[in-house]
């Protein structure tokens, strides 16, 4: 079960994974350097956790806890509970989907594994911001 940690200081170092997310270059550097990615919104957080990605932590306002209670119950990661104003201050944007999670990337499959049995393969080059 996740440990619930109430935080009221935007400078708390435990929130580092979520800091200044509007800066695409900073986010991409952080994600690549630390092998993590962020999920935003109840559905995406749920799907990422259910897909087996190791959860580093959760960040959410109190009103979103109930909707993800089953996911939190199945995780050992800390859940940082913050006000919506503090979430916006930390991330740099209004967290309108209510919940964020920091997850560890799993190793990528080899080219051979991707192509094995594939009928169609799509290659997308020069993607600057994968969220778009």
Sequence positions of predicted segments:
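Solvent-exposed alpha-helices and their adjacent loops that cap or buttress functional pockets
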Residues: 29-31, 92-94, 113-117
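Short coil/turn connectors at secondary-structure junctions
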Residues: 54, 77, 97, 117-119
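Glycine-rich phosphate-binding loops that contact phosphosugars or nucleotide phosphates
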Residues: 101
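RNA substrate-binding interface of SAM-dependent RNA methyltransferases
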Residues: 2-5, 43, 50, 106-108, ...
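A glycine-rich helix N-cap at a beta->alpha junction
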Residues: 73-92
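Short loop/helix-cap segments at secondary-structure boundaries that form the rim of catalytic
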Residues: 67-75, 112
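Boundary-proximal intrinsically disordered activation/regulatory segments immediately upstream
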Residues: 1-67
């Amino acid at each position: 079960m996740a440990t619930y940690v109430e935080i009221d200081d935007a400078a708390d170092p435990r929130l580092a994974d979520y800091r200044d997310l509007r800066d695409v270059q900073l986010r991409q550097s952080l994600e690549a350097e630390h092998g993590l990615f962020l999920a935003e919104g109840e559905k995406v957080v749920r799907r990422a956790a259910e897909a087996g990605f190791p959860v580093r932590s959760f960040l959410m306002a109190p009103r979103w806890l109930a909707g993800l209670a089953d996911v939190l119950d199945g995780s050992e990661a800390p859940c940082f509970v913050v006000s919506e104003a503090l979430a916006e201050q930390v991330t740099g944007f209004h967290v309108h989907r209510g919940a964020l999670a920091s997850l560890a990337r799993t190793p990528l499959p080899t080219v051979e594994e991707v192509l094995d049995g594939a009928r169609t393969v799509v290659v997308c080059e020069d993607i600057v911001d994968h969220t778009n």
